[in-house]
């Protein structure tokens, strides 16, 4: 998965801040855009609102990228349809077809898991997981919210 360009991150952040009525906030430097976007999406959820679609998509992708960066490998595929999927976690890798370890969940559940707002056990009924390695509880939340490689 290619790294998101700052322009895409900034556009998603701006759109979410406008939806939150915080359009006049000073934009963060490029190095902080990802964290600012995650915070804006969480603020929407905290306010009882749905994040704007672009911000939701980009945030899900940012958090999946962090998981894959911190726990590289190809033994587990994590899917957040329709937004993104990554392969991560060292171990036996697959080369064709569906991987033996697949985790799939919706974007809100993924964001809440990745940021430590909910635990794997609390979200179990909203996660489809198959395979002996399809449990990310020891790897969540992602940095800077918790788990470190």
Predicted regions and their residues:
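C-terminal interaction segments
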Residues: 1-37, 98-149
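A structural signal for well-ordered alpha-helices, especially hydrophobic packing surfaces
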Residues: 17, 41-45, 68
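Negatively charged, low-complexity tracts enriched in Asp/Glu with abundant Ser/Thr
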Residues: 39-58
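Short coil/turn segments at secondary-structure boundaries
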Residues: 51-55, 66, 97-101
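A glycine-rich beta-turn/hairpin centered on an aromatic-Pro dipeptide
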Residues: 54-76
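Short leucine-rich amphipathic alpha-helical surface patches
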Residues: 71, 82, 114-118
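Amphipathic protein-protein interaction modules
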Residues: 75-93, 97-109
């Amino acid at each position: 998965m290619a790294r998101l360009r700052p322009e895409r991150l900034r556009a998603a952040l701006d759109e979410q801040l406008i939806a939150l009525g915080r359009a006049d906030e000073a934009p963060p430097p490029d190095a902080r855009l990802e964290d600012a976007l995650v915070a804006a999406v969480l603020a929407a959820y905290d306010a009882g609102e749905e994040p704007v679609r672009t911000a939701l998509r980009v945030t899900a992708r940012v958090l999946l990228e962090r998981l894959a960066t911190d726990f590289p490998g190809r033994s587990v595929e994590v899917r957040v349809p329709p937004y993104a999927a990554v392969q991560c976690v060292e171990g036996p890798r697959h080369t064709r077809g569906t991987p033996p370890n697949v985790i799939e969940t919706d974007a809100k559940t993924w964001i809440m898991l990745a940021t430590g707002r909910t635990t794997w056990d609390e979200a179990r009924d909203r996660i489809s997981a198959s395979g002996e390695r399809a449990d990310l509880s020891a790897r969540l939340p992602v940095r800077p919210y918790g788990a470190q490689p």
